[in-house]
């Protein structure tokens, strides 16, 4: 019996070379690095941040799948601009070439555009409280950019969309909305992001316009 398996053309294989003794084997598609941490963070702040940003912005626009969300110019532009901000951070902190980062972002977005491997936005956006965490994909780069003197307006706009995620079948979304109703967005965001209510990021998020439904 044969089984057809659908796979993605996108993959990334970065290998920590510090533990390899002798010559490094030549394997197509493998990148050997002495310190894998910058590449891990590049993946987290591009693939994870981008995927989730598309989901939250798409949900706010009333769209069902990642593929459909990326066909909406408002979602695509919002996610792309947020990734430009994380790209700036990656270039500054880890020394990545800006042009290489741009090409990497394009490959990642092309992966998400694949209609044959498209996720439901509600699945990708699940667990919004965790994703609002201080060390997570949106708040962490936003705080670090602010420490650099940058204003992460596009990441802030995505965080505003996270606050609006109210899918009734997601336990964290239900808790988030209950907290917002009881305490307001400012206190809820500060609590879940682990920052003070008067932190400039809180103000920047709340100044962002709520995404208009498509």
Predicted regions located by residue number:
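Substrate/ligand-engaging "lid" and interaction regions
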Residues: 1-214
């Amino acid at each position: 019996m044969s089984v057809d398996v659908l796979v993605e053309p996108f993959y990334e294989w970065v290998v920590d070379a510090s533990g390899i003794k002798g010559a490094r084997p030549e394997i197509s598609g493998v990148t050997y690095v002495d310190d894998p941490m910058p590449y891990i963070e590049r993946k987290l702040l591009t693939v994870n941040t981008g995927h989730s940003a598309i989901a939250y912005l798409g949900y706010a626009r009333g769209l069902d799948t990642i593929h459909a969300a990326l066909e909406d110019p408002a979602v695509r532009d919002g996610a792309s601009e947020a990734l430009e901000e994380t790209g700036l951070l990656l270039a500054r902190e880890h020394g990545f070439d800006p042009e290489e980062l741009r090409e990497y972002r394009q490959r990642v977005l092309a992966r998400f555009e694949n209609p044959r491997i498209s996720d439901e936005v509600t699945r990708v956006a699940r667990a919004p409280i965790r994703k609002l965490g201080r060390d997570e994909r949106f708040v962490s780069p936003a705080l670090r950019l602010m420490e650099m003197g940058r204003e992460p307006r596009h990441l802030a706009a995505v965080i505003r969309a996270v606050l609006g995620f109210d899918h009734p079948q997601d336990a964290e979304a239900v808790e988030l909305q209950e907290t917002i109703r009881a305490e307001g967005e400012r206190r809820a965001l500060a609590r879940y992001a682990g920052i003070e209510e008067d932190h400039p990021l809180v103000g920047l998020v709340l100044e962002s316009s709520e995404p208009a439904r498509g």
